[in-house]
Amino acid sequence: MKQMNKLITGVVTLATVVTLSACQSSHNNTKLVSMKGDTITVSDFYNETKNTELAQKAMLSLVISRVFETQYANKVSDKEVEKAYKQTADQYGTSFKTVLAQSGLTPETYKKQIRLTKLVEYAVKEQAKNETISKKDYRQAYDAYTPTMTAEIMQFEKEEDAKAALEAVKAEGADFAAIAKEKTIAADKKTTYTFDSGETTLPAEVVRAASGLKEGNRSEIITALDPATSKRTYHIIKVTKKATKKADWKAYQKRLKDIIVTGKLKDPDFQNKVIAKALDKANVKIKDKAFANILAQFAKPNQKQPAQK
């Protein structure tokens, strides 16, 4: 469950076990544990845990969460969070709660993770939209771009099923579309898709493979890895129609801009730049030297993040 444990790719992992946020609102001498001849207070717990890697990550996620909630709270609705949560829950079915527990998460903490991810994604996308895109960037995007294509796509959970289907479509006189309808496990038995190389709702491996096929050609078995579930799926593609690519990149300028902007969402350096901007706007100051370096990855070159007195 790689993606469930990642808040933002290459940026920060939520540590939900550490309760530093609760410590902030408690008196330092509040007793957490008592025993014969001794007690453990909030202060004891804080001082014991604050230098651990888990605490460092927890504090970083807490800082980013507070900053982005302040600046973008109304940009992500509870409905969006619930929808994303349900999508993952549906993918795991009855094992979802077990997978959450194995990842150190509860439904509530996972929803918080989803919300923060979406807040940061919104900020990154808005910043990307406002960035100046050079002609060089457009030309590079154009060179990699494949315009609209239509393909019959079969999807399988098991590789052996994909192999059996591949043998079936290789047979002389085989009807790929009919076999696809019969064999695919896709919802509603959908097999016909129209998309371009910037498509994000299909597996990236499938889009790349289709982009590389000529009209009328069929693929071998394509293995795709779902980043949200770390689950492999298997696909067979036949491209039935492919638009001729126009010679001038300007004919696709709007679409190319969308693709470039979407690409920024996957760029850790650009993400860090946006987070750094938000932290700077919030005037974040680290007061405890134990956490002096948690924002180092967001600092400008040669800029340190000393603890503030």
UniProtKB/Swiss-Prot annotation:
InterPro entries: Foldase_PrsA (IPR023059), PPIase_dom_sf (IPR046357), PPIase_PpiC (IPR000297), PrsA_foldase (IPR050245), Trigger_fact/SurA_dom_sf (IPR027304)
Reaction equations catalysed: [protein]-peptidylproline (omega=180) = [protein]-peptidylproline (omega=0)
Record EC number: 5.2.1.8
Annotated lipid attachment (N-palmitoyl cysteine): C23
Membrane protein topology class: Lipid-anchor
GO cellular component: plasma membrane
An example molecular function term from Gene Ontology annotations: peptidyl-prolyl cis-trans isomerase activity
S-diacylglycerol cysteine: lipidated positions: C23
Domain PpiC: 146-241
Keyword annotations: Cell membrane, Isomerase, Lipoprotein, Membrane, Palmitate, Rotamase, Signal
Record's signal peptide: 1-22
Uppermost EC category: isomerase
Biological processes annotated in GO: protein folding
Keyword Metal-binding: no
Pfam families: Rotamase_2 (PF13145)
Keyword Signal attributed: yes
HAMAP family per the UniProt record, alphabetical: Foldase_PrsA
Family per record: Belongs to the PrsA family.
Protein name: Foldase protein PrsA 2
Native source species: Streptococcus pyogenes serotype M3 (strain ATCC BAA-595 / MGAS315)
